[in-house]
Curated annotation (Swiss-Prot):
Keywords: Coiled coil, Microtubule, Motor protein. One of its GO terms (molecular function) is ATP binding. It comes from Oryza sativa subsp. japonica. The gene is KIN7B. PANTHER family: CENTROMERE PROTEIN E, KINESIN-LIKE PROTEIN KIN-7C. This is Putative inactive kinesin-like protein KIN-7B. The lineage of its organism: Eukaryota, Viridiplantae, Streptophyta, Embryophyta, Tracheophyta. InterPro entries: Kinesin-like_fam (IPR027640), Kinesin_motor_dom (IPR001752), Kinesin_motor_dom_sf (IPR036961), NACK_C (IPR021881), P-loop_NTPase (IPR027417). Residues 276-298 have a biased composition (Basic and acidic residues).
Length: 699
């Protein structure tokens, strides 16, 4: 780079002058007389002071350094207008050079203040070229502007202010640069080359920085997990406090109601003779809300098909709801009234009655199937052998014969009546254990069904098929009897009436119920996973029962049902007394059903979720966006971690979104007396014969 040439430049060493404390700057500035000023600067003056600092003693070749610093003191000549200065000749040329250099300096400062990476024209003038390190390098710059308050110079004053405001925006970075000699630079490069060669020969496996980052990431994950646990504990404590306050308020209300009513009613059906209830005719409409009933209701959801599900629910409407009853050809109708329209002398339905009513549809269905197959030449005769009678005992089929002439109870969900002419046409009723559906295996016009052979020899025994559910119902009846005996003893000791205390056992110890609910909920979740229960059933149950005091009986029934199913699976083979289709024939079959359900949920993700929601779901569930079959990966991770309640809650939320569950509260809690798993129903191509049947599944 060629050095800057200037005639008036001079270089003077001031070492000797500094020691003598006397030094004067030689006069290099040019001054001249103009119309505006008698002594006007006709050139810029720059004074550069360079200071070098080095050690007084020799410390070695590597440590012999010298610090060099420079300071520029610049006196800029003022700009002038030729029309006002009335300059000519030499004064005019000097003014032109001054204005040109000031214009170049203003351009450089304006572009530096903008902070852009555009080209900076330092070479437009010698002034900007000399001041380049001070303006945009590692230096600190201070500028003093001189203005004229005269009105005639207002434009020059405005330009000067603009120049000063731009100079304030210039950012510099003052730092010390290390200038190395050629020998020192060669030695430094040789050392660096040797270091790089050694690293290539012996590569470092992992740096300490990467290890430190991994440790920090692990700490962050642990802290996030602890925060989630603390939040869940806080929410749980708040829910416990609310339940406790609500239970105490309900208990006080029950005591006030019991003090007002002392009328006794005759013993109700299914209760010991010593147990009495208050006459409901003496209780007002508000007091009748205290009764907790278990009833079965009919829900027609198919739009044009007569599909019937067995369900249970609390009737909240004061109006009467009449339902047609009929079991495969029975044309008689029975009305089922809600609890507010029930006769005043009739007691509420007990749990024992409800469990008995659950058993009756299966018994009646089997009897009707047996009678229809005896009248048809195309079907095999379903009979009872002596060996079957010995296995089932003497109660179940005797009860079946007695129930033939007994009218249906008000809590029973009636099966839809079928046309009379359907008795003349027959085909085999096929219940698929894999899909929990009833399908017809005969011709297109066949509407009579029979059970599929449970064994390879083709013999079907109706009484042995119903012993499994009979044992389960008997077990639940025994549980209900113990529950009532305990309630009776406690209320006799306290002198209270049973009919006015709808929440037995739970209201007596409200503080223990939240802990008991958590324990039972965890056991139920683990049993769901062990028995391969439907994910939809888990979701409905988990979202519906939040730990209220009235949920205790449903939690107990679900726990008993799952324990019964687990014990059945633990025997290693399907028991001969299990209902065909009501229980999964083996753990392998249950696992296959669960796998098909996960595939169904994976297909629902494409329909229910948008692209952004699917990507968010993949990220949330730890599925790589670049992997294949991402939806199936998410579906396979649902309800897998039984110990993590947050995982269970997220799984239930996602499944509910995929199946279109808007408000879990719309589902009646009593429907969980039976199973709530969705059932696929076979459809007929001809709309005239589009009968569809449904049966509850206990798996």
């Amino acid at each position: 780079m060629r050095a800057i040439q200037k005639k008036s430049l001079c270089h003077t060493s001031i070492i000797s002058c500094w020691r003598r404390r006397e030094y004067s700057i030689p006069p290099q500035a040019n001054f001249g007389e103009t119309f505006l000023n008698e002594k006007s600067s006709r050139s810029h003056q720059i004074l550069r002071l360079t200071v070098e600092s080095s050690a007084r003693e020799f410390l070695g070749k590597d440590k012999s350094t010298t610090l060099v610093a420079s300071a520029n003191f610049v006196d800029l000549a003022g700009s002038e207008r030729a029309s006002q200065a009335l300059s000519a000749g030499t004064r005019l040329k000097e003014g032109c050079h001054i204005n040109r250099s000031l214009l170049a300096l203003g351009t450089v400062i304006r572009k530096l203040s903008m902070g852009s990476n555009a080209h900076i024209p330092y070479r437009d003038s010698k002034l900007t070229r000399i001041l380049q390190p001070s303006l945009g390098g590692n230096a600190r710059t201070a500028i003093i502007c001189t203005l004229s308050p005269a009105t005639s110079h207002i434009e020059q004053s405005r330009n000067t202010l603009l120049f000063g405001s731009c100079a304030k925006e210039v950012v510099t970075n003052a730092q010390v640069n290390v200038v190395m000699s050629d020998k020192a630079l060669v030695k430094h490069l040789q050392k660096e080359l040797a270091r790089l060669e050694s690293e290539l020969r012996h590569p470092v496996q992992s740096s300490s920085l990467e290890t430190l980052l991994k440790e920090k990431d692990n700490q962050i994950r642990k802290m996030e997990k602890e925060i989630k646990e603390l939040k869940s504990q806080r929410d749980l404590a708040q829910s416990r406090l609310q339940d406790l306050l609500q239970s105490v308020g309900d208990h006080d209300l029950n005591r006030q109601v019991q003090g007002k009513h002392s009328v006794r009613s005759p013993p109700s059906v299914g209760m010991p003779p010593s147990v009495s209830r208050d006459d409901s005719s003496q209780v007002s409409h508000d007091d009748s809300d205290l009764y907790k009933e278990v009833r079965c209701i009919e829900s027609n959801r198919t739009g044009g098909n007569d599909q019937l599900d067995l369900s249970a629910g609390e009737s909240s409407s004061p109006q009467d709801s009449n339902m047609n009853s009929g079991l495969h050809g029975n044309d008689s109708n029975a009305s089922v009234n809600s609890r507010h329209s029930r006769p005043s002398g009739e007691a509420p339905i007990t749990l024992e009655e409800h469990l008995e009513n659950i058993r009756r549809p299966f018994v009646s269905l089997a009897k009707d199937l047996g009678s229809s197959t005896r009248n048809s030449s195309n079907l095999r005769v379903i009979g009872r052998s002596r060996s079957c009678r010995s296995l089932t005992g003497s109660t179940m089929f005797d009860d079946m014969e007695m129930d033939d002439c007994t009218p249906l109870n008000r809590s029973l969900v009636e099966f839809p009546g079928r046309p009379v002419e359907s008795h003349r046409r027959g085909s085999a009723l096929h219940y698929d254990a894999e899909t929990d559906t009833l399908s017809r295996a005969g011709s297109m016009s066949s509407e009579i069904s029979t059970f599929k052979d449970a064994k390879t020899n083709g013999s079907v025994a109706c009484d042995t098929e119903f012993t499994g559910i009979g044992e389960f119902v008997a077990e639940l009846k025994e549980m209900a009897q113990v529950h009532y005996q305990k309630q009776l003893g406690d209320q006799n000791a306290n002198g209270k009436s049973i009919g006015l205390d709808p929440i037995e056992g739970v209201s007596q110890s409200p503080s223990r119920w939240p802990l008991e609910f958590e324990k039972k909920q965890q056991e139920i979740i683990e049993l769901w996973q062990a028995c391969s229960i439907s994910l939809v059933h888990r979701t409905y149950f988990f979202l519906l029962f939040k730990g209220e005091a009235a949920d205790s009986i449903y939690m107990e029934v679900e726990l008993r049902r799952l324990s019964f199913l687990r014990d059945t699976y633990s025997r290693g083979s399907t028991p001969s007394n299990a209902i065909v289709g009501s229980l999964s024939t083996s753990p392998v079959a249950s696992a296959k059903k669960l796998q098909r359900e996960r595939e169904m949920l994976a297909r629902q993700m494409q329909k229910r979720l948008s692209t952004e929601e699917r990507e968010h779901t993949y990220t949330k569930w730890g599925v790589s966006l670049d992997s294949k079959r991402r939806k199936l990966q998410v579906a396979r991770r649902l309800w897998t971690e039984t110990k993590d309640l947050e995982h269970v809650r997220e799984s239930a939320s996602l499944v509910a979104k995929l199946i279109g569950l808007q408000e879990p509260g719309q589902v009646l809690k009593e429907m969980f007396g039976l199973s709530f798993a969705p059932q696929q129903q076979p459809t007929r191509r001809r709309s005239s014969n589009g009968w569809r049947y449904g049966i509850p599944s206990f798996a």
